[in-house]
Amino acid sequence: MPEAPGPAPAALPARGTLLAFDFGLARIGVAVGELETRRASALLTLHGEASAPRFAAIAKLLDEWRPVGLVVGMPSHLDGTPHEMTARCRRFANQLHGRFGLPVLECDERLSSAAADAALAEAGTHDWRARKQVLDAVAAQIILQHFLDTHGHAKP
């Protein structure tokens, strides 16, 4: 069965905030970035599997940060074929668009968690418990930085 397409891509303004999500069944990593500066930062990790509290927390983040768009990491295998989580991530992207009405853009997230783990180890976070607490937010940062580096506007 073919996958349902994600939300239609939308043009983004030259300035404004983006929030990015590294969607997982137990955790969602969140990062924030600015279109003008083209820089992303890890923000936080949402914990729990229940949909209502997740979307309530996301609504609070949207109210606080007032983003002009959202980016959702889309997993795939190294050869580009869909990952078992691809359809769930696309559904999450569609739910974000439907609930909040903001442009939602998809971004390849291949190896983002591995890159996040390596970056945390290099930064001196060797305790696996401490790394696990921030891993998803750093993965979201990597996804958003990749998006900012490869999409849209010229760097200042």
Curated annotation (Swiss-Prot):
<dbReference type="InterPro" id="IPR005227">
    <property type="entry name" value="YqgF"/>
</dbReference>
<keyword id="KW-0963">Cytoplasm</keyword>
<dbReference type="InterPro" id="IPR012337">
    <property type="entry name" value="RNaseH-like_sf"/>
</dbReference>
<keyword id="KW-0378">Hydrolase</keyword>
<dbReference type="GO" id="GO:0000967">
    <property type="term" value="P:rRNA 5'-end processing"/>
</dbReference>
<dbReference type="Pfam" id="PF03652">
    <property type="entry name" value="RuvX"/>
</dbReference>
<dbReference type="InterPro" id="IPR037027">
    <property type="entry name" value="YqgF/RNaseH-like_dom_sf"/>
</dbReference>
<keyword id="KW-0690">Ribosome biogenesis</keyword>
<dbReference type="GO" id="GO:0005829">
    <property type="term" value="C:cytosol"/>
</dbReference>
<protein>
    <recommendedName>
        <fullName>Putative pre-16S rRNA nuclease</fullName>
        <ecNumber>3.1.-.-</ecNumber>
    </recommendedName>
</protein>
<comment type="similarity">
    <text>Belongs to the YqgF nuclease family.</text>
</comment>
<keyword id="KW-0540">Nuclease</keyword>
<dbReference type="InterPro" id="IPR006641">
    <property type="entry name" value="YqgF/RNaseH-like_dom"/>
</dbReference>
<comment type="function">
    <text>Could be a nuclease involved in processing of the 5'-end of pre-16S rRNA.</text>
</comment>
<dbReference type="GO" id="GO:0004518">
    <property type="term" value="F:nuclease activity"/>
</dbReference>
